[in-house]
């Protein structure tokens, strides 16, 4: 296989992979919005438990956001520091 063709295939597949990795950012966004909405409902029901509810929500959102950040890192690596290009020879 021609080196230029192989490089084109690797770059194309890497772009598709980066796009798929960024789709993974939808999950944390939807989940965090849902959690924030439920936290607001909980505070409306029990205003005295506001501190506990908010701190638990923020901890949960931080854990959920880590998956979105990991997918962003993978997408950036595939686009700008592609490890597969060095394997072509």
Swiss-Prot record:
Localization annotation: Cell inner membrane
Membrane topology reported for the UniProt record: Multi-pass membrane protein
UniProt keyword terms in alphabetical order: ATP synthesis, Cell inner membrane, Cell membrane, CF(0), Hydrogen ion transport, Ion transport, Lipid-binding, Membrane, Transmembrane, Transmembrane helix, Transport
SUPFAM superfamilies: F1F0 ATP synthase subunit C (SSF81333)
Predominant location category: membrane
Gene3D superfamilies reported for this sequence: lithium bound rotor ring of v- atpase
CDD domains: ATP-synt_Fo_c_NaATPase (cd18184)
Signal sequence residues: none
Ranges that cross the membrane: 9-29, 58-78
Entry GO CC: plasma membrane; proton-transporting ATP synthase complex; proton-transporting two-sector ATPase complex, proton-transporting domain
UniProt-listed InterPro entries: ATP_synth_csu_bac/chlpt (IPR005953), ATP_synth_F0_csu (IPR000454), ATP_synth_F0_csu_DDCD_BS (IPR020537), ATPase_proteolipid_c-like_dom (IPR002379), F/V-ATP_Csub_sf (IPR035921)
GO molecular function: identical protein binding; lipid binding; proton-transporting ATP synthase activity, rotational mechanism
Annotated site location: Reversibly protonated during proton transport: 65
GO-annotated biological processes: proton motive force-driven ATP synthesis
Keyword field contains Nucleus: no
HAMAP family recorded: ATP_synth_c_bact
Assembly and oligomerization: F-type ATPases have 2 components, F(1) - the catalytic core - and F(0) - the membrane proton channel. F(1) has five subunits: alpha(3), beta(3), gamma(1), delta(1), epsilon(1). F(0) has three main subunits: a(1), b(2) and c(10-14). The alpha and beta chains form an alternating ring which encloses part of the gamma chain. F(1) is attached to F(0) by a central stalk formed by the gamma and epsilon chains, while a peripheral stalk is formed by the delta and b chains.
Family per similarity comment: Belongs to the ATPase C chain family.
Listed NCBIfam families: ATP_synt_c
Function text: F(1)F(0) ATP synthase produces ATP from ADP in the presence of a proton or sodium gradient. F-type ATPases consist of two structural domains, F(1) containing the extramembraneous catalytic core and F(0) containing the membrane proton channel, linked together by a central stalk and a peripheral stalk. During catalysis, ATP synthesis in the catalytic domain of F(1) is coupled via a rotary mechanism of the central stalk subunits to proton translocation. Key component of the F(0) channel; it plays a direct role in translocation across the membrane. A homomeric c-ring of between 10-14 subunits forms the central stalk rotor element with the F(1) delta and epsilon subunits.
Protein name: ATP synthase subunit c
Origin species: Fusobacterium nucleatum subsp. nucleatum (strain ATCC 25586 / DSM 15643 / BCRC 10681 / CIP 101130 / JCM 8532 / KCTC 2640 / LMG 13131 / VPI 4355)
